[in-house]
Amino acid sequence: MQPLQILAIVALVVAGIIAIIVWSIVLIEYRKILRQRKIDRLIDKIRERAEDSGNESEGDQEELSALVERGHLAPWDINDL
């Protein structure tokens, strides 16, 4: 094999590894965004019910606390919301 062919193969492998890493990071961030949207919707729902009825919904509070107590999606990420 010529050095140019070896270099091309190595470059493709490196590009593939970088693509996998980037898409993994994108997926982790997307999951965080979806989780935060779900938490925001539950908070809004609790606020609406509190305004309407004068008390808060126990089921929504339990679901919200379960989401918040779930922990980190990525254990190496210490900047959690």
Swiss-Prot record:
> Which lineage?
Viruses, Riboviria, Pararnavirae, Artverviricota, Revtraviricetes
Gene Ontology MF, one: monoatomic cation channel activity
Q: Does the keyword Phosphoprotein apply?
A: yes
Please identify the protein, giving its name as recorded.
Protein Vpu
Record text on activity regulation: Ion channel activity is inhibited by hexamethylene amiloride in vitro.
Q: Which UniProt keywords apply?
A: AIDS, Apoptosis, Host membrane, Host-virus interaction, Inhibition of host innate immune response by virus, Inhibition of host tetherin by virus, Ion channel, Ion transport, Membrane, Phosphoprotein, Transmembrane, Transmembrane helix, Transport, Viral immunoevasion
Membrane topology, as annotated, equals: Single-pass type I membrane protein
Residues the record lists as Phosphoserine modifications: S53, S57
In terms of one coarse class, where is the protein primarily found?
host cell
The Swiss-Prot or TrEMBL note on domains reads: The N-terminus and transmembrane domains are required for self-oligomerization and proper virion budding, whereas the cytoplasmic domain is required for CD4 degradation. The cytoplasmic domain is composed of 2 amphipathic alpha helix that form a U-shape.
Topological domain spans for side Extracellular: 1-7
Where is it located? Host membrane
Organism encoding this protein: Human immunodeficiency virus type 1 group M subtype B (isolate JRCSF)
